[in-house]
Amino acid sequence: MIPCSDRIIRNAPGPFDAEVVLDYESRLLRRKRLACAGGDFMVDLAEVASLEDGDAFALSDGRIVVVRAAAEPVLVVRGPLARLAWHIGNRHTPCRIEADRLIIRQDHVLEAMLRRLGAEISHQNLPFRPEGGAYGHGRTFGHDHGHAHDHHHA
């Protein structure tokens, strides 16, 4: 019988029996069969979860499998960061914010817009670990954040 996990250990301390490497999209899941060096296992969570690098699955056979963020194509953005971050956020685009750069997933439309705004952009392959959002762990699921308001997107 294939081992199963219905529990995530957030920011797991280790030690780990195996690791599973997932890209950003694959780290959003509820029910899925995953493969690691120790064999396949089934994830069966009560609700959809956004997994972060360092979270882990507690398997029914006692093993702990840590999640690692896979390297994937990203845009590394430098320039007037406050202005660039505002435009990225206005489009509800997941973004990693660092002291001297922003990191977003590759998108040719956003790349063209950011270049017009004065950004210097390089294409790299890095683990994508965007900011989690103000209203919950990991991603923001939709746009509802507990209050009503009107705003318009440019």
UniProtKB/Swiss-Prot annotation:
Main subcellular localisation: cytoplasm
Gene source species: Paracoccus denitrificans (strain Pd 1222)
Annotated GO CC locations: cytoplasm
Species classification: Bacteria, Pseudomonadati, Pseudomonadota, Alphaproteobacteria, Rhodobacterales
Signal peptide bounds: none
Compartments reported by the entry: Cytoplasm
GO MF annotations in UniProt: nickel cation binding; unfolded protein binding
Function recorded in the entry: Involved in urease metallocenter assembly. Binds nickel. Probably functions as a nickel donor during metallocenter assembly.
Keyword flag Metal-binding: no
A biological-process GO annotation: protein folding
Official protein name in the record: Urease accessory protein UreE
Family the UniProt entry places it in: Belongs to the UreE family.
